[in-house]
């Protein structure tokens, strides 16, 4: 039976951080043969793994290493002068993470001229700091993960570009950005009574770049009790860093929710959910979920930090893209000189080919502080092949800071909540939504604009209007909403319209229950 296939790509072009302590997974793969190495080589391994019973990887580590505490482990650092390809002055370099309490065995390989060779662990590649250990007696531990370096912000220094560390997590940087949101290879049953399953990248193959290379190719093998997979990552650094992903999955057993291209990020509070006691006005890596449907609609959902876990979704026949964005890029919105939340990148997934019908699912989990990643978003296809049959999909993953993906017309600049001149009852809330963008800037003076709003569930619109804010040029949608049942969440939708012309994306807001 042929693969359930989406078209393939062209040529290269913190969910709580504690969850990185995922269950140990697949066994290490033996050294590769002399056959030419390519994506299909990894896919063959994934298919073979899927046909065999799942076998957890032996996670034993030397007693000396296991006895190290968190700070002692952090004192182990890769020696930069030992970086892969540094001696050859290639544009990309790779350094490795040492295994530790949260980093299970990951096997590394290098691909040169279509031939793969194993990269063994060498204790001499690491500086163990003040730790009094004897790593030369530990044998081949393999590694905990990897990070790629590239001269992203200037020729004098090779910055971190992309990191693969823990389960199937990875994150990247574009020029000028600081680490924020993460992505994963796959999410399995993120919500549910049985708990989430965390697939792991258990083996990587790093393709040696040419001396003038502008992109780096990485292959990875994914494994878990119910899914195996082959991945190809083509990383193109720049003002916008592009990671083009090709994947082929094989299910060992059925899963309830298969989440493709998952994002993980943090939202503690912001202008739509202010904090009373912190001097910082906002604390978040991302402030909204943006979705583009195949029907041409653009949706913006402001993120929230709920009391109880909230799972919502946007169903559609076709997906044009979705992403977790940090639209507010003003330092004064955060006032954090260390975290610099205004420099956190946005991530946008652009499917390659048709992904068919499905839904974008958003999971929001309450968090007391900024140390936990509490937001997850991913695509769930309606149709998943049965165990043993392949599922192919590809996408472009855009990491952006200076030029964010936006709708072609108007888009939400901010969402604020709270009373104005008039007091609010316990079952009422007022929402202030500012829209900006080319479709609004081009309106002639005096153009009539109206707010089109609805409360599809548990809400009554008491007042809604739209007007231009003279000080900023934005158009403001103001609505007052009553909640019949204050214990339940309320879905709200709104956009601006002039005559028959829709001027903006749809503001899709979730007002949590008490």
Regions found by a protein language model. Give the residues of each.
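A contiguous, surface-exposed recognition patch within enzymatic or periplasmic domains that forms
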Residues: 71, 163-165, 177, 256, ...
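Extended, loop-rich substrate-binding clefts of extracytoplasmic carbohydrate-active enzymes
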Residues: 180-238, 356-364, 368, 372
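Acidic, contiguous internal or C-terminal segments within carbohydrate-active enzymes
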Residues: 220-266
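Solvent-exposed N-terminal domain segments of exported/luminal and surface proteins
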Residues: 39-40, 47-192
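N-terminal secretory signal peptides that target proteins for export/translocation
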Residues: 1-13
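Bacterial N-terminal signal peptides
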Residues: 18-30
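Terminal accessory/anchoring regions of large secretory-pathway or extracellular enzymes
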Residues: 34-70, 74-79, 98, 333-514
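Beta-strand cores of secreted/periplasmic/IMS beta-sandwich domains, seen most often
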Residues: 107-114, 243-253, 395-397
């Amino acid at each position: 039976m042929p693969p359930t296939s989406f078209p393939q790509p062209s040529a290269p072009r913190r969910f709580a951080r504690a969850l990185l302590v995922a269950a140990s997974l697949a066994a290490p793969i033996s050294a590769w043969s002399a056959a030419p190495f390519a994506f299909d080589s990894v896919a063959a391994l994934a298919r073979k793994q899927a046909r065999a019973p799942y076998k957890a990887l032996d996670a034993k580590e030397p007693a000396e290493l296991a006895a190290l505490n968190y700070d002692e482990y952090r004192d182990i650092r890769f020696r930069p002068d030992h970086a892969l390809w540094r001696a050859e002055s290639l544009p990309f370099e790779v350094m490795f993470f040492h295994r530790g309490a949260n980093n299970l065995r990951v096997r590394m390989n290098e691909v040169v001229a279509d031939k793969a060779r194993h990269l063994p662990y060498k204790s001499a590649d690491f500086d163990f700091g003040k730790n009094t250990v004897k790593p030369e007696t530990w044998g081949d531990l393999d590694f905990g993960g990897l990070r790629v370096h590239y001269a992203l912000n200037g020729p004098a220094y090779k910055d971190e570009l992309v990191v693969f560390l823990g389960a199937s997590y990875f994150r990247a940087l574009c020029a000028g950005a600081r680490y924020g949101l993460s992505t994963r290879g796959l999410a399995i049953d993120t919500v549910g009574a049985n708990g989430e399953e965390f697939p792991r990248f258990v083996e990587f193959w790093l393709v040696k770049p040419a001396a003038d290379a502008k992109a780096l190719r990485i292959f990875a093998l994914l494994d878990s009790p119910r899914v195996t997979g082959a991945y190809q990552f083509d990383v193109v650094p720049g003002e916008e860093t592009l990671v083009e992903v090709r994947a082929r999955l094989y299910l060992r057993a059925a899963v309830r929710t298969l989440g493709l291209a998952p994002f993980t990020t943090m939202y503690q509070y912001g202008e739509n959910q202010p904090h009373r006691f912190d001097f910082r006005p906002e604390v978040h890596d991302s402030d909204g979920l943006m979705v583009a449907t195949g029907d041409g609609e653009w949706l913006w959902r402001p993120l929230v930090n709920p009391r109880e876990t909230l799972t919502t979704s946007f169903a559609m026949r076709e997906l044009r893209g979705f992403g977790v964005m940090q639209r507010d890029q003003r330092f004064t919105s955060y006032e954090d000189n260390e975290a610099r939340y205004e420099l956190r990148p946005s991530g946008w997934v652009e499917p390659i080919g048709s992904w068919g019908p499905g839904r974008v699912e958003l999971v929001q989990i309450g968090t007391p502080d900024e140390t936990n990643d509490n937001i997850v978003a991913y695509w769930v296809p309606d149709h998943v092949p049965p165990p043993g049959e392949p599922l192919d999909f590809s996408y472009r993953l855009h990491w952006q800071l200076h030029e964010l993906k936006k709708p072609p017309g108007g888009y939400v600049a901010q969402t604020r909540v709270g009373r104005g001149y008039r007091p609010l009852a316990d079952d009422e809330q007022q929402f202030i939504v500012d829209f900006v963008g080319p479709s609004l800037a081009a309106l002639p003076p005096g153009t009539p604009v109206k707010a089109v709003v609805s409360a599809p569930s548990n809400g009554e619109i008491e007042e809604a209007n739209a007007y231009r804010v003279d000080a900023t040029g934005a158009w403001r949608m103001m609505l007052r909403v009553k909640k019949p049942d204050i214990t339940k969440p309320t879905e709200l939708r709104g956009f601006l319209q002039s005559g028959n012309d829709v001027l903006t994306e749809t503001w899709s807001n979730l007002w949590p229950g008490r």
